[in-house]
């Protein structure tokens, strides 16, 4: 079993708030310093226009509760959140490609 897992967090903007309101809330919550929590690796952070921010994190399973609490503490109020267990499909894809070639 791996000592870490990947988690993808979908942060959907609260469209009832404008950008200034969102940034004010994030500053008040110290979002940029607190997220992701210490010990959690930021793998990628992308924006999908019309959807929101998509953040992929690598963390030990023991830090999953800390991630949850930080999302509740800092993100709620300006984002709705969805969290998904994630894995790297590239090695699986390569295995399948090799199998179907033979």
Explain the meaning of each model-derived region.
Residues 70-74:
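A short linear boundary/processing microfeature
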